[in-house]
């Protein structure tokens, strides 16, 4: 298989060197040896002229490693070859964009992308972040599908070229990437979903709801803007639309993506450094921390290198999804591991998870306090000492129940009533019942009503489920009892054969009757012995 030195994926510039072997070389008279033709193995020829197979004025060289031959190449061919391997061309040396080099690069990208896709399905758990895990898996599948479709199409085209021309040109990869709409669409969708996953990962670092909403709002808008810019640049180039106003859009989109990736890398690295006390005692977390820092910094570093030297422009359409896949997956894995360590530390502590009071307004914490205000211990010594400390230096010591109703005064402890201290409110009253604005009522209704409906529907479903299970259990118990009785009576015998055991049954009433009869007979015999029938008149 031969490789063209014109196998650059970039747009060629002006040619600075003209290869003479493409115009032909006069070899003169001599013998022509053709080992494949046995009939005319050696032929004498005159005025032999030889020209190399060239592609757009650039010769094709054999890419295979052949054995050393004692024959020497003509000086013209050697000069062209030296120019090919030692001099820079339009945008760099062509050897870096040879066919085998490109195949090795894309094969590596394919293996890494597919492996990370499989790992995302095996290791990424849903948990409380179902949407994020779904987006991560979907974007991984799209990236894998894109690279598989790209390699399949490119290799089939190279195979046809080899069969038809006897050579293969690496321009197939660049042409396919710059013209195929399917690959462009898959790459755009995968990178957009990866950016949304990165926004969700950054939002997980903030515990407060307000900060979480700000991150999601700003990050979501930035991701959508980046997606729109990338879509415009990609589709205008592939469809063939030329607009002078869109010339600066492509570099602006690239710089915008670099800024987003730099922010993401900075936040992840800051989190790794900020949580070092949590993972510093675990050896595996050391490896994961170093890997996370290296990979999240790799994306902006590669993009910046591409801007400065054009390093990735030939592979940008496939390297960019790979970099997003690696950084997103590793950052997700880091957060999962550090979250487990934090939860383990919170379980050991007394306080547990943090609760912010301003976030609980209108939520369960406030409702719990209001519903349990009657459970406060108003007769405890702590309340008495608290109120004594509050009003020790106050003028309210001289007021004797002027602000309390009879019902509120009766609810006070006996020790406090005897001191003559008056309070503006009841002891066990929690002051949540302040006058609220219409916006507060509307916000409270918006947040509380769906929660109440959810709780009510959940209780109804649980009650119906419990009732159905109870009825089912009762029916099963009743059927079991009937079956047991039928089995004891022999009613389950299909052959209608019944065997009974005979047994004397003695009832308790029969035993009592026999004992009473025996006692009566004994009593009559004793009476007859003392009072004979004919001796009554002698008494």
Curated annotation (Swiss-Prot):
Residues 123-130, 194-213, 270-284, 332-539 are cytoplasmic. Keywords: Cell membrane, Membrane, Transmembrane, Transmembrane helix. It is a multi-pass membrane protein. The chain crosses the membrane at residues 102-122, 131-151, 173-193, 214-234, 249-269, 285-305, 311-331. One of its GO terms (cellular component) is plasma membrane. Required for the proteolytic cleavage of the transcription factor RIM101 in response to alkaline ambient pH. Belongs to the palH/RIM21 family. This is pH-response regulator protein palH/RIM21.
